[in-house]
Amino acid sequence: MVLVIILIVPRDDSSRIPRIDYIAVAEQAAESSKNPIIAPELEKDWWSNQAKWLGNPVDAVPRFEVGFVGPKNEYIGMIQAFGVNPTWLALTLKDVVLEKNFSNQGSEIVWAIHRAPEGNDQPRARDYFWVTTIGENAILLYGTGSEAQFETLSQNIEAKLGVE
């Protein structure tokens, strides 16, 4: 009788990772930090799985971090860091090398694209970075999404920055 009960209990196949209202978190972070936090528009079927403000981290670089998940479980993380110093940036990018620079059509913003050297069996989230600096601040995108997905997200970020 116990076996029959176990077999008829429906299984929940939904994602166990909650969707986060990253826009609300960004608004709260902007209000508390007095920094211009960016909450880019997402493409259809993309959602956020985490968003947080690190106002007083050990490395002394305050930042907003948000993760985005695509319809096929692609992942792109975004770090918007304030008061970035060369050491912090070098440590963050220590496992990747500069591959090329990229600018969206008509944009003044230059994204430095970094990639991990070949050899990893499985792609890791921090094997691929797009980085731009604006004054003493930086925006870093990283993850397993395609180059086209990174390009689209970078365009959406630039739209929030007011860069055309």
Write out the residue ranges for each language-model feature.
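Ser/Thr/Pro/Gly-rich low-complexity linker/stalk segments immediately outside membranes or between
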Residues: 12-25
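Short, solvent-exposed recognition patches
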Residues: 24-124
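A short, solvent-exposed beta-edge/loop patch
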Residues: 6, 100-164
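Alpha-helix boundary/capping residues
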Residues: 11, 95-96, 157-160
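Hydrophobic membrane-insertion alpha-helices, especially the h-region
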Residues: 1-10
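Generic surface-pattern signal
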Residues: 9, 30-35, 159-162
